[in-house]
């Protein structure tokens, strides 16, 4: 085999490699993409339809993600109450509930696109508070209904209860994506990451905190998450290490139940008549406002309440005192301060303090709703002293006076809508006192920290963890595909190298064989010549001897 033949084989291999390379790194098809995400929260569920235009020159269209809008320009979002977790004892009602959520998505996504449109139904802390048996029963009914009714791209793994860490991570991604913090900036030695912002989210059943850290030393692995936006498998340009913690039972509604239970226990301890208690004074309610709740005689432990069979109807009567309210709230934060060397947060959890001098935190859900009620949202800058004065002023206002003020400020609301509106405002003294206590004492934010930004949207896009979930899942898919491509290319390269080595070995083998044959032939030729010469000499000698014999007498 000649070197010309080897060159021909190498050219063929090169062509094959190029064709494989082109196929492997083929750009995503151009077109409109859709994805449906249902946020099944503790107090209600919300369905979002996101869309993006995949670009021919891009492996990912994440930069174009937005909420799908109808012909009138309204977002395709559907809300349903109560929360999915409330259906544990009424499973037969789940199909109607799910259909009400998905009807808008089905009518706004083109029929031809529905089989390629992923559908995710993800429940949060409300579901996490249920037993695993109840969760399984709910999800079984949800999955069965979706698979038998809709054409969306749906797997059983698409309907599940997300962890608190996932909820915090998704919220952090949403905030920084909408702020453009994932865009690389030019640097002296190439592109560099931007500083990111932190995220705080207080829902109905849990509270999340998430922020980027430079070092994870002394942090348990359960508090550390990583997020990558890299396209190159081996690049570390856009990898983020995060501190993420979710406090189950410390959402606003769950903490209120915990707080009422605590007052009930304290009343029993102080009055030795716990089981006869029908009225308990509550400094976290406005004076003149009452709340009636069903309470069981059981201690409050950790994040959850112990199971109990007995229930008592208790009326909590408001006395409106911020200082006493905070005094009652703080023991429930369980601040033991026993961890070392890092400070301890709620429930004695290790927390690495962020850079309070530079890092902004965006406050979602109750961080916005509560501070908005106090009229302490942007453009008003967060200030602890100002917020405290506002809380004290609000807590000391009699209920009827507060109610009258709200009526004057909302004359455009019908009676029905006003009553619904009041439902979100009536616990303002409790909500504000708890939120500020959790923020400054529970999570260690200094009282001079002024970089909290409570908000519902960024750049006119609603801020929801569901957007972060979409980006995370799309990016994870992209990274998986890129890894597969890298593996394929690596395999092709190894294959080609092996083939080349085999060809070289074959050529070397035949070259050696040919040289050996040539050498042998040369040797054989020399021997033949010598033999011929020898025979000629012998013949000549014989002829000479014969001539001598003839001359002898």
Q: What do the predicted segments below correspond to?
A:
Residues 54-71:
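Beta-propeller domains
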Residues 3-6, 30-32, 42, 115, ...:
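Short, well-ordered loop/turn elements at secondary-structure boundaries
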Residues 531-553:
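Intrinsically disordered, low-complexity cytosolic terminal tails
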Residues 35, 49, 76-112, 120, ...:
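Helical "lid/coupling" subdomains associated with nucleotide-phosphate turnover
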Residues 9-16, 498-501:
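Hydrophobic alpha-helical cores of multi-pass transmembrane domains in eukaryotic membrane proteins
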Residues 43-45, 53-56, 128:
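Primarily extracytoplasmic ectodomains and periplasmic/lumenal surface modules that are beta-strand-rich
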Residues 2, 13-35:
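N-terminal signal peptide
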Residues 38-46, 199-206:
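A short acidic Gly-Thr/Ser loop motif
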């Amino acid at each position: 085999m000649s070197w010309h033949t080897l060159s021909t084989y190498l050219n063929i291999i090169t062509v094959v490699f190029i064709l494989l390379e082109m196929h492997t790194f083929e750009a995503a098809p151009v077109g409109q993409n859709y994805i449906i995400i249902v946020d099944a929260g503790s107090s209600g569920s919300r369905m979002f339809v996101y869309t993006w235009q995949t670009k021919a020159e891009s492996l990912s269209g994440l930069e174009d993600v937005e909420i799908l809008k109808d012909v009138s320009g309204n977002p395709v979002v559907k809300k349903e109450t109560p929360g999915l977790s409330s259906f544990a004892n009424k499973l037969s009602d789940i199909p109607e509930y799910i259909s009400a959520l998905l009807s808008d998505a089905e009518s706004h996504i083109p029929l031809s696109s529905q089989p390629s449109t992923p559908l995710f139904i993800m429940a949060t802390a409300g579901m996490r508070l249920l037993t695993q048996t109840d969760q399984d029963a709910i999800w079984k009914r949800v999955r069965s209904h979706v698979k038998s009714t809709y054409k969306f791209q749906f797997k059983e793994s698409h309907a599940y209860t997300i962890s608190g860490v996932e909820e915090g991570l998704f919220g952090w991604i949403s905030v920084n994506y909408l702020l453009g913090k994932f865009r690389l900036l030019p640097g002296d030695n190439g592109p560099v990451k931007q500083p990111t912002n932190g995220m705080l989210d207080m829902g109905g059943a849990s509270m999340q905190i998430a922020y980027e850290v430079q070092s994870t030393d002394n942090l348990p692995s359960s508090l550390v998450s990583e997020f990558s936006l890299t396209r190159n498998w081996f690049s570390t340009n856009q990898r983020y290490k995060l501190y993420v913690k979710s406090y189950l039972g410390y959402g606003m509604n769950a903490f209120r139940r915990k707080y009422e239970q605590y007052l009930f226990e304290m009343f029993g301890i102080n009055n030795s008549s716990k089981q006869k208690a029908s009225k308990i004074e509550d400094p976290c309610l406005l004076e003149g406002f009452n709340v009636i709740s069903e309470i069981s005689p059981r201690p409050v432990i950790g994040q959850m309440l112990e199971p109990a069979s007995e229930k008592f109807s208790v009326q909590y009567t408001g006395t409106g005192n911020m200082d006493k309210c905070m005094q009652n709230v703080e023991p429930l934060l369980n601040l033991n301060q026993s961890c070392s060397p890092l400070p301890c947060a709620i429930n004695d959890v290790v927390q690495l303090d962020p850079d309070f001098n530079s890092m902004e935190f965006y406050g979602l859900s109750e961080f916005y709703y509560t501070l908005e009620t106090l009229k302490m949202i942007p453009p008003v800058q967060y200030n602890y002293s100002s917020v405290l004065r506002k809380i004290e002023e609000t807590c000391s206002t009699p209920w009827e006076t507060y109610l009258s003020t709200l009526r004057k400020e909302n004359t455009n609301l019908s009676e029905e809508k006003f009553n619904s509106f009041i439902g979100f405002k009536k616990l303002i003294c409790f909500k504000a006192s708890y939120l500020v206590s959790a923020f400054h004492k529970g999570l260690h934010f200094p009282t001079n920290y002024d970089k909290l930004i409570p908000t519902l949207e960024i750049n006119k896009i609603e801020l929801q963890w569901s957007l972060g979930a979409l980006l995370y899942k799309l990016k994870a898919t992209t990274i998986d595909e890129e890894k597969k491509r890298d593996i394929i290319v690596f395999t092709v390269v190894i294959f080609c190298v092996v083939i080349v080595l085999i060809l070289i070995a074959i050529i070397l083998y035949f070259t050696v064989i040919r040289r050996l044959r040539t050498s042998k032939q040369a040797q054989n030729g020399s021997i033949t010549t010598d033999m011929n010469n020898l025979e000629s000499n012998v013949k000549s000698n014989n002829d000479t001897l014969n001539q001598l014999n003839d001359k002898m007498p």
